Amino acid sequence: ADNAGTIQTGDNGIGIYSKKLSSGPSTVNHSGTINVGNADATGIFLEDGGNLNFSSGAINVGNDSYGIVVVGNSPFNYTNTSAATVTLGNGSTYFYSNNPTTNITNEVSLNNPSGVGIYGISSPGTIVNNASFTLGDQSVGILNTGTGVATNKGTIVVGNSDTENKNYAIGMATTTGKVINDSTGSITVGSNGIGLFADGASSQAENNGTINIAGDSGM
């Protein structure tokens, strides 16, 4: 599937849907614009692996929706560059995967300092972030949901936590794997924010870079 034009999805809609072929993996090349609706809408949905090339173009995501979703267990490859752009509404996620083969090196920056409850990357595979994420209150930069390693080499800024409702602002988090803020990495959190969060018997958090606590009671 190749998209160099403009796609508009409604609420709970999907812009591009791709599924593994009987003859092998499918490939999506996106260099156009996808405007994603609200309420669990998705820009690009890849089922059972495949290849995604997002080296230019844009994905503009509404509220409580997703830019890219990857599900299944077959091998998945993601190529992206800093020329690609993603905008996110409240409660939305740039990249979500439940595919353990997902190995993502991210170059796409995110910038919504007033957005609430945004997730940058949520994936069980290996994650390397080289880009800048500036997100608002109750947001999470990188969530490692697997047993692998997520590494931040870029900049992650999140706002304040809502501790009363247990909605936290976190730079990087995991309950089963490892999160690393690399020597070139920088994480900044607001009031009651958490720079690195590892909660689980086998989880680990490692800081080799800079963590800035910009608000009261952060950690």
Task: Indicate where each model-derived feature is located.
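Beta-strand-rich solenoid/repeat architectures in extracellular/passenger domains
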Residues: 1-12, 24-41, 51-64, 76-91, ...
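Extracellular beta-strand-rich solenoid/capping regions of secreted or surface-exposed proteins
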Residues: 20-21, 123, 174
